[in-house]
Amino acid sequence: MAEETDEQQAPQSTFSTYMAEGEQLYHKAEYKKASDSFTAALQLQPEEKNCLVARSKCFLKLGEPECALKDAEASLQIENDFFKGLYQKAEALYAMGDFEFALVHYHRGYKLRPEFQGFRLGIQKAQEAIENSVGTPASVKLENKTDLQFISRQEESKKAKQKAQVKVQKKDSKQQKKVDPERSQKTVRQLLGELYSDKEYLESLLRDEALVKGNTRGGVKLHDLIINGILYLDTRSEFWRQQKPIYARQRDRKIMQQKWKRDKNKSADPSQYIVKSLEEIDQLLSSGKAEESYKKAQLVLKKVERWTSVDIHNREELTGSLHSCIGNAQMDMGQIEAALQSHKKDLAIAEKYKLLEAKSRALDNIGRVYARIGKFNEAIKVWEEKIPLANSSLEKTWLYHEIGRCYLELEQTAEAKEYGEKSQQEADAAEDIEWQLNACVLLAQAEVKLKHYQSAISSFENALERARLLHNKDAEQAILVALEDAKQGMEEQQESEQNNDENDNLRADGNTARDEEEEDVHVQRTEEDEG
């Protein structure tokens, strides 16, 4: 008994030992054991901020972003400007699908530690996630005087839609109809796929007032269960497909479906299997099952590689398409380098067999990978190669806008302005208000950096008009702030020019007086010499 007491009283290890053990386990990818070691260390020193961040990283790897967020916030309570805590909080928020709030913290950290590459990459990936997660590009990226701020918002319909999914629809919801257009519902349907019918079923249950008042046998309210189910589907649809807009994925899938349409009635032809497999691969990716999508695409690719061109026509084109699917899945899994190689394989096949549509797709994806990891020069080079292959005004306005953004990141402002103007022209041709808004903002940003304040004010005013047409209150408020900053910049520029003019006049007057004085001295000396 005494021996047991002695064992209980004796400390098992020191704080440093637990920390070292946790770090070793983390590097071995044994995240649960590493978390336990960090927990033991925190029992000895509960307010050790680096240990909190280390455990937060483990929770993130274990798929527990809420716990990761809790530890990150605890480290920030100890030190408000602890950059590791800020980064970890941003990463946790990103994993939870709260991209906009994650973006705020990436920017806070970048302002504190601009040399830390993680913040820069975080800004890039959060920005892209906000732009593409609901399927249509409706982001706004603004900059004010004090700090670079990306104010990216989806349509107002997104927020209205989320509220509508957890509350009973009211008959007089006229305002909601304005901000929840039919195309947004189509986007959600495409993102959820087969799960969309489940979502509709849950929403119908929510309208049954008698049902939602009941409880399960375990005492849990049915209302809460239904709400949680709907919220889960909302969260997943928000997070899925961050890298590529739905319209682009639809295009790729339709291309392949059209190629095989004439053969779909032949039961012995493998084209039926291929079309069905492509749909399943895309559906898995859209459902957030990137790893399953990847495995399915790999399986189909192996089968296709065993076939000959006699077995199946357009074999090479299909092979490239599967490499593209694999690359998209790898991007979602965070395997950036592997994704890049897969898309390059797609490009190589397209170039070898002169498949222009496939080449355009591959260049599109390669550019996205480069932009995501901050290699803006490489992204520009790839996307500029894609320009001749862009067929529609909508595709061109997106392409010019992305190239312009890359130039803006590289501080090559004149080029950013040039592509902003091109994007604006194509957006006008496409009559797409959302892209007109994006192009106007990009153009205004470039003009502010060039100190062309009058032009910037005009561009911001055009952007403001389009934000109001879209009923995008967030973008409207952000543009108003940027507009005031541009006006203030113009006033300061005018004051500076006026002061410079006055100084020039004073210098000119001083030079004249000095010349006259020197002339008088010269005359006086001449008279003295003559005397």
Swiss-Prot record:
Acidic residues composition-biased segments: 492-503
Origin superkingdom: Eukaryota
Disulfide bonds: none
Reported consequences of knocking out the gene: Morpholino knockdown of the protein causes disruption of the neural tube closure. Morphants show defects in ciliogenesis at early stages of embryonic development. More mature multiciliated cells display normal cilium length, but exhibit severe defects in ciliary beating, retaining only a twitching motility, but no organized beating. Outer dynein arms are absent in morphant axonemes.
GO cellular component: cell projection; cytoplasm; cytoskeleton
Stretches forming TPR repeats: 15-48, 50-82, 83-116, 275-307, 320-353, 360-393, 397-430, 437-470
The entry's keywords: Cell projection, Cytoplasm, Cytoskeleton, Repeat, TPR repeat
Tissues and organs where the protein is expressed, per its UniProt entry: In the mucociliary epithelium, specifically expressed in ciliated cells.
Protein name per Swiss-Prot or TrEMBL: Outer dynein arm-docking complex subunit 4
